[in-house]
């Protein structure tokens, strides 16, 4: 681990600050030992940790779009660049000379962990004075203490999710080196990776420690009476976007879910599944109940990604006040106006399109209404809120009720002329001819002086917990059984029937296909859950980890080491012909795991590489 670099980075903090959270080193006169003499520096240890974990780990800003780019390492998406590190990873061509992607993941998490350990060391953060009034000081430092444990748990889970795997040349399942002390760069550091099981226990322990200090949620209604009711400057929604108790229960649910999965649970210990279901249900209960005013989240309603306070949110990033990052990534170059400047960087695959069934909920392979010559007709209503395709129009949610753009992806004629403006290969357009609509519902770039809206990334939302619960509970009680107040079938049925992101009606609540699969038993229903998870969480950073944890090595290679495809469109007058078997890029993963950064392997004799990365040892 490059702890010397971590301390160098701390020195760089002298020259930078964040707009909302404080900097631990606001001027060049303060040292590491001075941090606890200044209240702004003490709080800055936590604030800067949010920064690290948001670049791009989730906590900072909407425009940190790691989650979308990670999808290009899966069968769901393809990046326009053919030399990008994430593309090389998926093609089995990633070399040690292009290791920055994994090195950045590793470094940002350990940078945050260093600062958090500094805060937690000898309980110094809890002993600090950040406010004059003792009562208020206690409120703030307790919250900061909880955040320190909670953010460390988030960083640790990110490390485990990205780097947990089987050791090269052995059989052990390993995680990351557990570090709970602020290590000194002058020390001769040579640490080893802890076992996967030990890393899970560490994450759970940090969540439990955080729960001792954090409020259940940062909501004003929790402080409407009693001696804390007049402390709204320090409690409640003023701390929105910071981790809270519900965040901790969510991290526990997601950690147990991974630990229970096939790759990391070789003996299929049911208790792990049960724990994942228990904590997911706890969050679901809280979100649905809401305040005494009856304003809880209704899971039949849509998720509004334009609403930074959407009720589905468990924990979100800080706001990006004026942002069009995802629109720029997903829209074609021709969709320009008023300095919008899109560049068509990420396109969806035919494989992902195939995950959507028909409008009645049946897979297209079993559909009575699907027509392969018209592959975009009569599809699952959710499809239309996620994918833009040839001849599809775009109408922004604000400023007009009329379409302002039509996607055109057809091939040129025999003379090489008259091709669609948005087709692959024509400038800055996606390579698959399938454009992503998710997250992009608001802006009207044709409107003079168009407004970029405040945005936030939903790090954890209700659907994460609903899907975690359904997957885990299905393994414990089956599709129709009840566990912690819910059945997997009911939870999945609600997700399928909910309003789409564009507020359109979902699959009919009757859903005969869902009923038939539920009656078929646990294994078929598990396959359905996997597909629902793929659809609902696309471009939210889960797919590669899911591909890995759901399989063993042979299954992973068989299922995913194959080409991915786009759609080739031919135009004849007003008639379009679609070929969804148009090969775009081959997938040839070296491993179901990401590699440990090569720098770390060279630096430390005890550090073991992940299976499949023989050239990185």
What are these regions (language model features)?
Residues 1-28:
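Bacterial Sec-dependent N-terminal signal peptides
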Residues 19-88, 101, 145, 164-176, ...:
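An aromatic- and glycine-enriched ligand-binding surface/loop that stacks and positions planar moieties
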Residues 43-44, 51, 82-165, 186-219, ...:
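Conserved, well-structured interaction surfaces
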Residues 381-498:
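C-terminal substrate/ligand-recognition segments
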Residues 217-237, 292-303, 342, 415-428, ...:
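Surface-exposed intrinsically disordered loops and tails
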Residues 17-18, 84, 109-112, 187, ...:
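Long, intrinsically disordered, low-complexity segments
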